[in-house]
Curated annotation (Swiss-Prot):
It is found in: Cytoplasm. This is Cysteine--tRNA ligase. Monomer. Its cofactor is Zn(2+). It comes from Xanthomonas axonopodis pv. citri (strain 306). The lineage of its organism: Bacteria, Pseudomonadati, Pseudomonadota, Gammaproteobacteria, Lysobacterales. A motif ('HIGH' region) lies at residues 33-43. Disulfide bonds: none annotated. The keyword Cytoplasm applies. GO terms for molecular function: ATP binding; cysteine-tRNA ligase activity; zinc ion binding. Binds 1 zinc ion per subunit. It is an enzyme of class 6 (ligase). It comes from the Bacteria. The gene is cysS.
Amino acid sequence: MPMSLRLHNNLTRRVEPFAPLDPSSPTLYVCGPTVYNYAHIGNARGPVVFDVLAALLRRRYGALRYARNITDVDDKINAAAQAQGVPISTITDRFAAIYRQDMAALGVVPPDIEPEATAHIPQIVAMIEQLIANGHAYAAEGHVLFSVSSFDGYGKLSRRDPDEMLAGARVDVAPYKRDPGDFVLWKPSSADLPGWESPWGRGRPGWHIECSAMAAAHLGPTIDIHAGGVDLQFPHHENEIAQSECAHGGATFARFWLHNGMLNFSGAKMSKSLGNIETVHELIARHPPEALRYALLSAHYRQPLDWSDGLIEQAKNTLDRLYGTLRDLAALQADSGNDVAPSRTIPVEVESALEDDLNTPLALSVIASIASEARALRNELVHGGEPSTRMSDLHAVHAKLLGAGLALGLLQQDPAAWFSRGTDAGDDARITALVEERSTAKKAKDFARADAIRKQLAEEGIVLEDTPQGVRWKRA
């Protein structure tokens, strides 16, 4: 097995060697969306980053049990349904489907398991009953609450002192709570809200218990890696630990905790409450989704990422160069009669970068270096290099570049598809025909016609490139 995989464990605040409890079946749980609205681009950072992690774990161990939940019962969902005058399922079904489509557009591979909270009510009720039986929860006025003071480990993830938390001005002190910091496991539902029968009356679960119950149902009482946004560290993840460990006799809930940093927009955290969001759905309508993925991977996952139009443009330009390199490599090999599709072998340098706490910026710099090597080799061949030996080198570096991209979920499109920017094949054919007409006009010394075509294409945002293999075009 290659060098050890090292991950920053937020539980210990250290980068540590990772090894799963069961090497034949590592487990990963990622907090998923609450489906009441479009996901903003900040919500997509975790799924993209942990998609890279999931692929790395599969390569390393040959298997993975990866769960990412759907929260489909929540007060925000109820409010959205009431505001729009539609059934709750209309809201949740619509936005769950859109979320899956948006993630697919970003190249995020679906998790193995995508549990929905409403499909796990029996497991949630059973876990709450166990917490009551173990002396960690109590019923009051149709509610069930977790007793924070009953768990000595409360605050170990967020490093918050329980007494300081209780003194916080934002703690909601309801009359049925024994202590201000106790949090809801079950709440009563009125007739107009979703609810299920339970030992405590008709009601619905709190948000935190949903993840604990779903993780246990599908991955067991102890999971290898729990991941999510740093904004979920407290109270959500802290409460998950308390519930899960108290329900399972003190068994460690998650061995490693990974948290991705927030996206900032104009210097402020991107959030729905601040109204400074850009939704994934809107962005993928305006930009190539792969450029968004590249941008999300351009900073280390634990660091904040300043999101801007300039960052997206930079990602587009970089991918233009990389796909241009791939296109030129393929064309040169085809011209030489060696157009066998290269294998995609992930370079050791890229794998090593990812095994160092998912260092995607370093992996991207390795990709840039491979592309530079490929361009230099191509230029050498075009300008009189030794074809018999160097063509095999070109084929190898082509495979290396594709493999490097594969590790990050990048560079797997046909270059023509990338440069088409999602336009239809008919328009591509029209542009290609104009480019060929311009070449014919130049050969016939009809420079007026050739210049007119170039001007027309430029107005359409088409850039022409003269290469030894002929004129190629791309969209600006």
